[in-house]
Structures are given as C-alpha cells and as structure tokens.
C-alpha cells in the first residue's frame, strides 16, 4: 500500500517482474507506485547513480502524508512488500449513482477509534486487500469539487487535529465533549407566538430559525397542517415556498425526494394529499429522515384512519386538517422530539425487551395466557417502554411501527395517565388495519415500595409498568378491566412484579458487566429477524443527549 500520498484518494498499482510500473485503469483516480530495488542504467557506464536516500520509517510516512505522487517519484524508492500489489479498477470503487442519496461522511471519521500507529498497516505478510484498500477506498466516489468536504475530517486528523488520550486511542472530533450540549435543551422549548401590536415577529422568527430540526406537514393545496416549531401564521411564507418547489417537480412528472443547502438537508415524503417535510442540521441521512416522516404519517392514520383521510380530501381538496387532528398535536410533537433526541426504538424501527431471565419471562407469558378473555386481541406487559411479554393471535403479529405508536402514546402523553392510571382509547394501528379502529385498555402500575399498585402523576416512565389490552369490541372495557385485576393478582403471587421491578432498577448492563476489563464503551445490536435490539448502558461515555443521539444515528 502506498502510504506516503494521502492528499487525495488513490489506488495501488502493480509492479511487474521487469521493474516496469503499470498504472491501474481508472479515469478519475491517480496512481502512484515506486518499484522496489529499481536501478536505472544510463548510457554512460562511467556515470555512477547517486546514493539512495535513507529508507523512511512509519513516523516519517505520517509526516510526509501530504506529499503528491509526483514528488514521490523524485525523492526515491519506498520500501514496498515483495509481492506485487493488486490494482484497484473502477468496479472496485463504490460509487453514488444519480438519484440516490448523498452520503453524509462527516460521521465516518468520528465513528473511528483507531490505535495511534500504522504498524498494523506495515505487516510483513503480503495482503492484496491491505495493499489495495484504505480508509478512503471505502468512501463513496464524489465529484472533484466535493473532495475537500468529504475528506475534511480525515485530512484534519492527519494534520494533528485529532488528539490522543491516555489509552492510546484517537479521539475524533465527533465524539469529543460536545460544546452544543448547553443549548441542546433549547431545541425543545417553544418559540413563542407573534403578538398583535407587539414588535416581536423578528425575535420569534430568529428563534424558529435557530432550531436544528423542523418537521412540517402541509396539504397539496399549500395549507399548513402541523409544524413542530411555531405556528401556521409564522411559517406560512416558508410553506408556500416549499409547496412551490414540490409542485415544480410534479409538473415535470418527477417527485422531489431531498435536496441540500449548505449544512441543511431537506427531505420530502408525499402521502396522497399530504406533504411531509423534514429539515435537519444534525447530520442525518435521507433514509433516516424518510423513516421519521413515515412514522408521523402513521401517527396521523392512528387518529383518522386512511378511509377518513381520503374521504376528507376527495370531497374538498382544500380541507383544513387541523380540526380533525385537534388533540393529536401533542402526540405528533412527542414523536418528533423522540427522533431529535435519538430514541433507538424509533430510529431503528425495532423494539427493546426488558432484560430478565428466560424462566421468569416464561412464567409471565403463561400468567398472561391463563388470564386472557374472549374479547382480547392483543395483550402486552410493558415496563419503562421495554416489552416484557405479549400474547397475540397465531396469524396476526404486531407491526413494529404500531408498537412504537402505542408506546409513544402510552408513555409520553401525560393525558393517558389521568383517571387513576386507567384509560380506554380508540386507536387505529395502520400496520394491522389502516381502515378501522381498535380499542385499547391501558392501566399503569407503580412498583415503588411506598405506593399502591396504581400509578399516580409522580410516577416516572422508568418506574411504571403498563398493562395494555387491545380488543375489537368497543363494549369490552369492563371485561378487560377484570382481566387486568386477575393478571396483577397472579403476577403478585408468583413474584413476577418483583422480578420486573428488580430488572428496571438494574437498568441496561454496562459493557464491563458483560466482558470485565473490556475497552468497549458502548454497543448496540439489532436482530433483523426478530425486529428487536439490545444495547449497553449509555453511562458514562454517552451521558449527554447530543452524544446519545449521535451514537444511535451512526448505528441506524
């Protein structure tokens, strides 16, 4: 591998047995190679070649990382491995096809934690993969004008910006102490309203612009329906601009998916008569933002159902959807804030289960099965937003998106905990059936020792356990209430509630609890087959909101 030229992406070239240099066939990359032990014979036999310069070592290679390939040929040979390297051709280089999203590569360097040495690159064993690949080899190909931005973090690391801690690990800028932590909490504060007779419009508008992330929902007619920050009057001008841009592409039989302006990414998702727009400055990909907008769409369907939404706009295309959605704005805002904070379940589209022993979970499952009634469709035991147990019909599994909507509604909406911790809620689960309503009975349990079983307003999300029973019969409230009472009684008798409480108190395990003495700070594993994930504790490395969000964003 040619380590001395790191100023721009390169491919390695092969040395033939006669000492000739063959460049790899590439139209957009530069090839530099110096053959080993090459001696050029001159026409005059009396002329002696100049002495060879001293062989560079690893540290000198690091210092000379900015040299060009032309200067390499002039300074003399470099010690390469004896085996000829393999040229990298155009098919070996990842490319970003037109129409696909532009990869945000600023997180690449931040995600790396490598040892501060190149000794692992100077192995005595000849390796074709090692000689033909580098950190830059895995980066999607971009135009020459974007090269500086794409590799800015890597070049900064080579120039000494990256610091080394006491463990010998490189501390990349993305995971250093966040200077934005102090004002990240302001992201969720209201921007205020423009008051009549008061000259505060500019101040409110500046607060709105200072937000790092915005979500907008508007109709095809250009009417604002919902926005995470501000109100319709404040953003009406911007909504008109966005609607004009979307309509311009639609008139050309094209669909606008995303575009970037500076460090701000705009993503647009069209769902029938509705436009969903995400505006982000916190380094998220198009795919991540698209999934978030689709989750907001499912939240709207959980309130209106798809037939009702279609009927409203078929009768009157300029329908104002604010009135039908009145009361669900809090749920939309709560879901949007979970994306901004970096909620793993929402960003990964997966569920997290409470960590308990298999035997204990088996007891809870059997208790839930024995307590079920005829009107029950789904039954769940949820602790702190993590699934403990679920019963369902054999051929009807719960969609992860539906469960996320339920958990967001149950644990984030304060109104659900009113009424002594007991609620009866009609809800549409779009993944199950987007055309009709189901009826959900929710009861919260407080497992604190100095309280009764029923949760009160002081019970936090992590301290409470929710019994969720779902039925297709809107008259089954009392039947499900009786099932809940029997279930709680049995869970107390077999000490399952105590097992759940202890698991909640323990929290997520630290990496050192799993592998003592490990240098691993944090891990997250997602099982695609089971649509579940597990993760270690955030503390102490990822205690801040911004660092947590960044780590989950990289994982997703």
UniProtKB/Swiss-Prot annotation:
Residues 1-80 are annotated as: Disordered. InterPro entries: FUZ/MON1/HPS1_longin_1, FUZ/MON1/HPS1_longin_2, FUZ/MON1/HPS1_longin_3, Mon1. Residues 1-13, 24-45, 68-80 have a biased composition (Polar residues). It is found in: Endosome, Multivesicular body membrane; Prevacuolar compartment membrane; Vacuole membrane. One of its GO terms (cellular component) is Mon1-Ccz1 complex. Its main location: membrane. Belongs to the MON1/SAND family. This is Vacuolar fusion protein mon1. It comes from Aspergillus terreus (strain NIH 2624 / FGSC A1156). The lineage of its organism: Eukaryota, Fungi, Dikarya, Ascomycota, Pezizomycotina. The gene is mon1.
């Amino acid at each position: 591998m040619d380590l001395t030229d790191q100023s721009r992406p390169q491919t390695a070239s092969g040395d033939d047995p006669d000492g000739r240099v063959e460049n790899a066939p590439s139209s957009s990359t530069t090839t530099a190679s110096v053959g080993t032990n090459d001696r050029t014979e001159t026409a005059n036999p009396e002329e002696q070649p100049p002495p060879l310069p001293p062989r560079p070592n690893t540290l000198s290679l690091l210092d000379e990382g900015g040299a060009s390939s032309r200067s390499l040929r002039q300074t003399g040979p470099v010690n390469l491995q004896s085996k000829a390297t393999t040229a990298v051709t155009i098919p070996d280089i990842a490319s970003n096809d037109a129409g696909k999203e532009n990869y945000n590569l600023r997180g690449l360097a931040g995600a790396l934690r490598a040892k501060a040495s190149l000794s692992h690159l100077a192995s005595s064993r000849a390796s074709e993969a090692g000689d033909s690949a580098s950190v830059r080899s895995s980066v999607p190909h971009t135009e020459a004008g974007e090269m500086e931005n794409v590799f800015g973090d890597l070049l900064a690391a080579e120039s000494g910006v990256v610091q080394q801690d006491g463990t010998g690990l490189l501390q990349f800028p993305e995971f250093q102490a966040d200077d934005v932590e102090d004002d990240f909490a302001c992201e969720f504060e209201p921007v205020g309203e423009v008051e009549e007779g008061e000259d505060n419009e500019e101040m409110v508008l500046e607060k709105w612009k200072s937000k790092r992330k915005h979500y907008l929902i508007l109709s095809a007619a250009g009417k604002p329906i919902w926005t995470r920050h501000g109100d319709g009057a404040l953003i009406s001008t911007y909504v008109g601009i966005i609607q004009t841009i979307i309509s311009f592409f639609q008139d050309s039989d094209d669909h606008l998916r995303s575009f970037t302006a500076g460090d701000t990414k705009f993503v647009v998702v069209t769902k029938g008569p509705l436009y969903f727009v995400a505006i982000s400055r916190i380094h998220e990909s198009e795919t991540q933002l698209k999934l978030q907008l689709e989750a907001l769409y499912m939240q709207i369907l959980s309130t209106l159902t798809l037939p009702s939404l279609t009927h409203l706009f078929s009768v009157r295309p300029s329908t104002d959807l604010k009135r039908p959605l009145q009361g669900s704005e809090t749920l939309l805002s709560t879901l949007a804030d979970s994306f901004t904070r970096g909620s793993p379940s929402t960003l990964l589209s997966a569920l997290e289960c409470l960590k308990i022993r298999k035997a204990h979970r088996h007891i809870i499952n059997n208790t839930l099965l024995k307590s079920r009634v005829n009107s029950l469709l789904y039954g769940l035991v949820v602790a702190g937003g993590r699934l403990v147990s679920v019963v369902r019909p054999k051929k009807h599994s719960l969609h992860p998106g539906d469960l996320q909507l339920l958990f967001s509604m149950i644990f984030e909406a304060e109104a659900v905990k009113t009424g002594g911790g007991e609620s009866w809620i009609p809800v549409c689960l779009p993944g199950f059936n987007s055309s009709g309503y189901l009826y959900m009975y929710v009861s919260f349990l407080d497992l604190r020792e100095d309280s009764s079983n029923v949760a009160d307003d002081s019970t936090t999300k992590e301290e409470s356990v929710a019994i969720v029973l779902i039925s297709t019969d809107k008259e089954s409230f009392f039947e499900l209430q009786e099932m809940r009472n029997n279930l709680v009684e049995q869970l107390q008798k077999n000490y399952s509630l105590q097992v759940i409480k202890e698991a909640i108190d323990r929290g997520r395990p630290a990496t050192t609890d799993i592998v003592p003495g490990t240098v691993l700070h944090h891990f997250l594993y997602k099982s695609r087959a089971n649509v579940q994930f597990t993760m270690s504790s955030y503390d102490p490395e990822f205690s801040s909101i911004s660092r947590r969000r960044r780590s989950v964003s990289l994982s997703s």
